[in-house]
């Protein structure tokens, strides 16, 4: 069973720290959802935690304001590092005090954030290195 918690940005870091101090050893997933034209606020951060010792899971959901900025939790869970970078790269969400908030999947000079629902597709020709030739 998973406990779902909807929390505010202001409570986010403190709640994650509380989970860490109460036996939730693992942050197992961190992603974002773009609710474009369906919900306000548009973006939501979803983070899953696991306590092996207690055999419990917790899912935290945080609705993001228009600033799209939230504290990084890499100081509490180093495993959040690449997840936060991926969410930054794909959605444009800023993680304050992240040790290396740079693109992780897209080229450094890429413009835009491809998993946003308003991101145009098919506009930019992409050259794939070592792509097999197809007849």
Predicted regions and their residues:
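Terminal low-complexity/charged segments
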Residues: 1-135
């Amino acid at each position: 069973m998973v406990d779902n918690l909807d929390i505010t940005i202001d409570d986010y870091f403190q709640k994650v720290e509380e989970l860490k101090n109460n036996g939730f050893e693992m942050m197992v997933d961190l992603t974002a959802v773009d609710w474009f034209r369906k919900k306000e606020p548009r973006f939501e951060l979803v983070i899953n935690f696991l306590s092996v010792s207690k055999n419990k899971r917790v899912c935290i959901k945080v609705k993001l304001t228009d600033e799209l900025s939230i504290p990084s939790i890499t100081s509490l869970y180093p495993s959040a590092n690449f997840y936060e970078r991926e969410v930054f790269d794909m959605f444009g969400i800023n993680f304050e005090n992240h040790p290396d908030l740079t693109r992780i999947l897209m080229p450094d000079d890429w413009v835009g954030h491809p998993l946003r629902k308003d991101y145009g597709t098919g506009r930019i020709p992409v050259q794939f290195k070592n792509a097999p030739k197809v007849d």
